[in-house]
């Protein structure tokens, strides 16, 4: 049986960028490449080093929301399958450590 599972995930990454806007753009682009239909919300963008540089280090916290379609008989199995599918999508990226949970 095909089921739609609503999920949300939160993560934090550190990256080098030319400014706040570049850091935001990089994170949003990378997340949308892994999960095109997700809603991306950037929660916090902060410089990790106090002194200014041409290329700065940033820490970005974000939240993702969306639905994942899976094949499963039970709701509990559908949630597990959705989390597994998301972990596979983000494996090998700097976003591989997102904490996932079911919504609703």
PLM feature spans:
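Long, contiguous binding/interaction regions
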Residues: 1-61, 65-67, 71-104
